[in-house]
Amino acid sequence: MRLLLRESNITNYWLLLIWSSFLFNPFTIATCIGRPTSVLTTCAILYAISNAVAGASFTSMLALSFAGYLSIYPLLLFPPLIILCYDRRRPTSRPESSIGFVLGNVAAVAGSIYGLLHMSFFITGSWEFLSSTYGVHLLLPDLTPNVGLWWYFFIEMFDSFRNFFLGVFWLHLSSYVGGLTIRLRRQPLFVLTILLGIFAIFKPYPSISDTSLFLGMLPLYQHVFPLMSYTFVESSIVLYATLLGPAFYYLWIYAGSGNANFFYAITLVWSLGWSLLLADILFAVLRDEWEVERPEMRGKEIRQI
């Protein structure tokens, strides 16, 4: 398996833009002000990706295990991350088969999570922490309003259908992993980026911390920005939702002059903006891949037949 490579002008300016776009992003700053534990998950995910790019697969799997230990959803990053580790692995005198490489890293992740869970059991003295941490993500007992799409739907849901739709929502979230990994198997780093954006929209309890992580990864693909078609519309929608979201929340929760539809409507707009951005950047990367494979078609219009 080989990575899809395209010459891109990665200068010191772009390197500066990449790290500054994450560190000085308003969403990142707001996350730090809120002091949530999600920053630990973000750190673990970035460390896992960094080590995967460097070819340190074992360290990458340890970091992914820690991220999955803190919250479940990072474990869905395993397929593209293992492909990235395999593509970037250091050459050895005894080449390792792909199956052996995958099984070894699966064992590393499983062993790490097993050790972390037993460490938590040793500290707390019981397994009750499982339902208080992972059970919250899987069963969605807390329907506190947030920027996600789950809470309002399950407020209106009849209890008899709750378990069914919990399975449907989790199946929907995890269904992107296989398709994107297979279709973009030569660009696993982009698969990781697009999955982080999907998680920021469709996970049970998303926050602006997830959004800041996705935005921090986007500048890695600055060379496909000219191929995007609707950046103004997407930016306007996100800015609109960012400014009105807190106002609608205040009107509903504190002022009492609105209802749940006010805030949920703006969360739909928020999710729409990011969904359009995901679709646009995905099209741009696929167009870039097509132009790399067919240089004679570069700059020509695509028509669907």
Regions from the language model: what does each represent?
Residues 1-128, 166-305:
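Multi-pass membrane glycosyltransferase architecture that uses lipid-linked
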Residues 157-158:
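Membrane interfacial helix-start motif at the N-side
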